[in-house]
């Protein structure tokens, strides 16, 4: 209870209360008040002291002691009339240019934006003649009439010529679709999809889930399909984040990189890295790729936000691109429901990756665009089982995928059109209706399922991937529109190459400079991506045209350097197993199969020598007594003498067999010794999967085995029997 005559305390209490900054740390913990805070709180509680007549005896600390009526005097100093902060125009221009470069660089982050004059940058970007609502502030009469208050009106043009030029420029840049002031006649007819299933991912509920994830996350990860990265991007969401949420970090994850060649993955990473940080990823619980690099990147983002206890990472993207699979891969166990169909994730959910990083799974969202129904189906947005006429989309599958891949997948050599292909496939797979008619509906669903799940090899080539056939010709202009792997007319291709050759002869030097600039730019971009793309286990088998592009020398150098860096860090045994995998596509263009086999044999022999050295070092560390070593060497010399005497005699049958075995041993040395786990796995594979089959082989059931010939016991049965006898 406060004393009735207590007027507040201005000094510091020396007791053990919270107003003593020097008290012993006890129940208060670490966050105790400091001396300045205690003085400030005491100041709030103070009251001036007055006598019985109401005159102030003791004023407050922050009150002035100057008597009332005294004339205040300001010190005459030039600083009162100068600017508080002065910056030169050249310095401001330099700061603006440097800041613009940093803001456009996807691999740089501005740490303290609040302490920088960001308003100067944004205001200077807008032109002086930006359109404003001038009539609301200055009327026409106050500018041009007899009551005008301005000497010179602010006009866009100073003369008729400039006015004509401005009118022509505005006419050329006019877009009727973007004109919101245009009066449109509403006829009540709109262009919409025929079926509701083609509107999946566009409902208000799904978009509400998306905005929840974006608002709750500090880092937004857009998952893309490596087969068609530009087709699965969402430019609307990217523009929304850049305009409305510029403080949130956006990165790209190129998932399903095991379905495309390695060079295409590398080129797409280089192209997409110009906009946002991009990582190649393969979602798999058993054999993932890019998991360590992704977790390291998230940790770096966590270090940027030191003011927060934890950060949230939201995963967005098209349906069926693998958002939930990426989260399961990062956690190394199933925490999200996954399925090879679209729409498995219904609502957003939080997953804990580590103490300071949380992951948010989001349903797939599709922005309404001009994509046809076939494009929507082939992107995997729609479930195949719900399509009423799946045979209408088979023609696009046959156009986008190469015929050699189709024939290799379905064992069909040739076809005339989509219907002919479906009929042959139905006859081959036995999908027939009554009367032997082919079941077109079921077969077309099979093909679409194979397309969505990656069983048909297909990928969209990155920009600048299709170059002229002559290696001496320089490439075309950088960053063109990506083209799909379709079969073109050979006559058209020959004419195009001839035209390109004629143009390249006339303009050879400038195009060569452009190609050098583009290669150097590619090298700078790929130098930032610390990923060994040679470790990607590519599943589909591509042809020679798709495996190695025409101009990939700049990327191969970076790949080899990245491999050398990682080989120094990792164990050689692991590298041997990874380099033996046939899926790595790092061989040069001119290598044939013999050269590849020769290179693999050299690598195997190299690692075999390394293992032998390791074994020798291991046994050399064991110390043997001197007496025992002398006895062993004496026995060894005697055995060597006897073997030399026996070798003079004629070789026997056993000796011949032994020599034959010794000759076969060097060829088997290169083979790797199987571990105990691999031997047990091979034994399990040889055994039959059915239960109770061996019973009929060893027993006489229904007089089928009248002689009762028991088969030889396995090693496991012999071991158990001997163990049982020893116990007795």
UniProtKB/Swiss-Prot annotation:
Keywords, ordered alphabetically: Acetylation, GTP-binding, Nucleotide-binding, Nucleus, Phosphoprotein, Ribosome biogenesis
CDD domains linked to this entry: NGP_1
Bias type Basic and acidic residues, positions: 498-520
Organism expressing this protein natively: Mus musculus
Stored InterPro entries: G_CP_dom, GNL2_CP_dom, GTP-bd, GTP-bd_ortho_bundle_sf, NOG2_N_dom, P-loop_NTPase, TRAFAC_YlqF/YawG_RiboMat
Comp. bias regions, Acidic residues: 553-586
Subunit architecture: Interacts with LYAR and RPL23A. Interacts with the nuclear importin-beta receptor and, at a lower extent, with importin-alpha.
Region of interest (Disordered), residue spans: 1-33, 462-521, 538-595, 636-728
Protein name: Nucleolar GTP-binding protein 2
Disulfide bridge partners, by residue number: none
Ranges of residues in domain CP-type G: 207-368
Biased amino acid composition, Polar residues: 10-22
């Amino acid at each position: 209870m406060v004393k009735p005559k207590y007027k507040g305390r201005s000094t510091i209490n020396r007791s053990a209360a919270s107003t003593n900054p020097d008290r012993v740390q006890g129940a208060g913990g670490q966050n105790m008040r400091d001396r300045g805070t205690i003085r400030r709180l005491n100041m709030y509680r103070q009251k001036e002291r007055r006598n019985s007549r109401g005159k102030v005896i003791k004023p407050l600390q922050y009150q002035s002691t100057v008597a009332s009526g005294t004339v205040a005097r300001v010190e005459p100093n030039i600083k009162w009339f100068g600017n508080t902060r002065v910056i030169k125009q050249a310095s401001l221009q330099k700061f603006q240019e440097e800041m613009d470069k940093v803001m456009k660089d996807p691999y740089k982050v501005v740490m303290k934006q609040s302490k920088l004059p960001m308003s100067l940058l944004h205001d200077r970007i807008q032109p002086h003649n930006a359109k404003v609502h001038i009539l609301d502030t200055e009327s026409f009469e106050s500018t041009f009439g007899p009551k005008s208050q301005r000497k010179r009106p602010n006009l866009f043009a100073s003369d008729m010529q400039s006015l004509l030029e401005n009118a022509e420029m505005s006419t050329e840049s006019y877009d009727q679709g973007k004109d919101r002031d245009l009066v449109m006649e509403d006829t009540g007819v709109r262009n919409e999809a025929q079926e509701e299933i083609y509107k999946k991912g566009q409902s208000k509920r799904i978009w509400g889930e998306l905005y929840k994830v974006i608002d709750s996350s500090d880092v937004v990860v857009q998952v893309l399909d490596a087969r068609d990265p530009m087709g699965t991007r969402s430019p609307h969401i990217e523009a929304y984040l850049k305009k409305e949420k510029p403080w949130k970090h956006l990165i790209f994850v190129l998932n399903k990189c095991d379905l495309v060649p390695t060079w295409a993955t590398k080129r797409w990473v280089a192209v997409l890295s110009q906009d946002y940080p991009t990582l190649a990823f393969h979602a798999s619980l058993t054999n993932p790729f890019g998991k360590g690099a992704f977790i390291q990147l998230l940790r770096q983002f966590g270090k940027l936000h030191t003011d927060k206890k934890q950060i949230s990472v939201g995963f967005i993207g098209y349906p069926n691109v693998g958002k939930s699979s990426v989260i399961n891969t990062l956690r190394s166990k199933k925490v999200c429901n996954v399925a090879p169909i679209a729409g498995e994730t219904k609502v957003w959910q939080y997953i804990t990756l580590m103490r300071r990083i949380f992951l948010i799974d989001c349903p797939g969202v599709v922005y309404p665009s001009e994509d046809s129904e076939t494009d929507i189906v082939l992107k995997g947005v729609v479930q195949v089982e719900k399509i009423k006429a799946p045979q209408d989309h088979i023609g696009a599958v046959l156009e986008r995928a190469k015929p050699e891949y189709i024939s290799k997948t379905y064992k069909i050599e040739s076809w005339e059109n989509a219907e002919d292909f479906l009929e042959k496939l139905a006859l081959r797979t036995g999908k027939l209706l009554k009367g032997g008619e082919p079941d077109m509906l079921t077969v077309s669903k099979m093909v679409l399922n194979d397309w969505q799940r990656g069983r048909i090899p297909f990928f969209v080539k990155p920009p600048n991937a299709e170059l002229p056939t002559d290696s001496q010709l320089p490439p075309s202009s950088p960053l063109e529109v990506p083209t799909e792997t379709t079969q073109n007319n050979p006559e058209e291709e020959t004419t195009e190459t001839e035209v390109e050759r004629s143009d390249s002869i006339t303009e050879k030097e400038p195009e060569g400079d452009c190609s050098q600039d583009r290669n150097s730019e590619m090298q700078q971009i790929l130098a930032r991506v610390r990923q060994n793309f040679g470790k990607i286990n590519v599943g589909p088998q591509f042809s020679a045209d798709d495996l190695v592009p025409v101009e990939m020398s700049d990327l191969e150098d970076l790949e080899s350097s990245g491999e050398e860096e990682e080989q120094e860090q990792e164990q050689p045994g692991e590298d041997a197993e990874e380099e033996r995998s046939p899926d790595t596509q790092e061989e040069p263009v001119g290598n044939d199969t013999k050269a590849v086999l020769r290179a693999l044999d050299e690598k195997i022999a190299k690692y075999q020598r390394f293992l032998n050295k390791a074994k020798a070092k291991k046994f050399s560390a064991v110390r043997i007594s001197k007496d025992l070593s002398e006895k062993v060497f004496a026995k060894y010399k005697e055995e060597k003498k006897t073997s030399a005497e026996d070798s003079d005699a004629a070789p026997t049958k056993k000796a011949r067999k032994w020599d034959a075995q010794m000759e076969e041993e060097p060829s088997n040395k290169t083979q790797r010794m199987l571990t105990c786990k691999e031997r047990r796995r091979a034994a399990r594979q040889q055994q039959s999967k059915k239960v109770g089959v061996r019973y009929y082989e060893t027993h006489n059931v229904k007089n089928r085995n009248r002689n009762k010939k028991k088969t030889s016991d396995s090693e496991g049965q012999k071991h158990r029997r001997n163990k049982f006898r020893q116990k007795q």
